Design a protein with these regions (language model features):
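Active-site catalytic pocket residues across diverse enzymes, especially alpha/beta-hydrolases
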Residues: 16, 20, 177, 189-193, ...
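Short loop/turn segments at secondary-structure transitions that flank enzyme active sites
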Residues: 112, 179, 311
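Surface-exposed alpha-helical interface segments used for non-catalytic interactions
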Residues: 10-11, 149, 171, 254
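Catalytic lumenal/periplasmic loop and adjoining terminal transmembrane helix
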Residues: 49-53, 58-65, 162-164, 197-330
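Cytosolic-side transmembrane helix boundary signature
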Residues: 19-25, 181-202
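Transmembrane-lumen/periplasm boundary regions of multi-pass, lipid-linked membrane glycan transferases
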Residues: 12-146, 152-164, 208-251
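Short intrinsically disordered, low-complexity coil segments enriched in acidic
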Residues: 1-17, 42, 106, 113, ...
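Hydrophobic/aromatic-rich transmembrane helices and adjacent perimembrane loops
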Residues: 1-7, 94-108, 155, 165-190
Length: 330
């Protein structure tokens, strides 16, 4: 994703700040930093063919396209169908919260405010410090880098009113920084409670959390993309899109194949009553079948009707998505 370029920007900013704090830092590290920056943009150019024609102009164009991308469809969010280019500012934040395990969210906020507290404390003491250091050691430097890298893309998509859809997938690259702050939260939590709770109990608690998350990984595989935490999982389909990519569609097709085999049908017609290219799912079928006929959203007396409840418009007002009340449901 284009916002990933923030990594090198932060690298340059932090290098610049280190230079202001210590003049010898530039002399010691200028060569390695220069190689890093040149290598970054060289590989960016090589592996991004769009830049080959006009690197600077095309890079700028990409940023503007990202912030003003015209998708033209609606997103099902908080129970309403909203234009993708007119989503509420909190869209990405809400999706991050509801699709991240509760324990991660708790420790993330602990780590987030812990690091933020140190950051503002260091800012307030800048004038009193002889060296004017924004961080006291390398660990604090990493903490600040991660919190900036987590916040900046989110703030950017909010300020630029970027077009988002399909959850927060456009921001998945910030997940490592989220996990880093979760780790900071665990560290701070342990530092606080170790005086009151025996180490053995703390280890058992963290082990149980680990087992729970491992269980969910196994349980949802390979459909981790439809994971919702316990805050919303029982009501997720009422307020949010579920399977944007249609990853589970192939199982529905396999069910149809097995069910149609009972009647020895020479061909099977399937109508799609949702916004998903169902025929694509045939590429990952575990059952071979050459007698499938996909009608799309047309109404031509199909033998089966499929829906994964994903729509680009409110289905109540779309005739193509209507399913007869007499249809037998599986």
């Amino acid at each position: 994703r284009i916002m990933g370029i923030l990594l090198i920007i932060f690298y340059i900013l932090f290098f610049f700040w280190d230079t202001l704090e210590d003049r010898k830092y530039l002399k010691k590290n200028y060569l390695s930093s220069l190689i890093t920056i040149i290598s970054y943009f060289t590989f960016l150019y090589i592996f991004w063919p769009f830049l080959w024609g006009n690197p600077i102009s095309n890079l700028i164009e990409t940023f503007f396209t990202f912030s003003n991308y015209n998708w033209g469809l609606k997103v099902f969010y908080l129970g309403n169908y909203i234009n993708a280019d007119d989503l509420p500012w909190h869209y990405a934040l809400v999706w991050i919260i509801i699709t991240t395990p509760i324990t991660y969210i708790i420790f993330f906020f602990i780590g987030f405010f812990y690091v933020l507290k140190i950051f503002f404390k260091n800012i307030n003491s800048l004038e009193l410090s002889e060296n004017n250091k924004l961080w006291n050691d390398e660990n604090q430097k990493k903490d600040f880098f991660m919190i900036f890298f987590f916040l900046s893309p989110i703030i950017s998509v909010i300020l630029f009113s970027s077009t988002l859809y399909g959850g927060w997938r456009h921001l998945y690259f910030i997940y490592p920084s989220l996990i880093y702050l979760v780790g900071s939260g665990i560290y701070y939590f342990y530092f606080v409670i170790k005086r009151y709770i025996p180490l053995k109990i703390i280890i058992i608690l963290f082990f149980l959390v680990f087992l729970h998350n491992s269980y969910n990984l196994i349980k949802y595989h390979p459909y981790q993309n439809i994971y919702f935490n316990s805050l919303i999982k029982n009501k997720a389909s009422k307020y949010f899109e579920i399977d944007y990519w249609g990853l589970a569609n192939h199982e529905a097709i396999e069910f149809i194949i097995n069910d149609s085999n009972k009647d020895n049908l020479s061909s099977v017609t399937i109508r799609t009553a949702s916004f998903t290219p169902l025929s694509y799912s045939t590429k990952i079928l575990n059952i071979k079948s050459n007698n499938l006929i996909f009608q799309g959203t047309t109404h031509s007396n199909p033998q089966y009707i499929f829906t994964n409840l994903h729509y680009e418009r409110n289905p109540k007002y779309q005739k193509k998505y209507m399913i007869p009340k007499t249809t037998k449901k599986f």
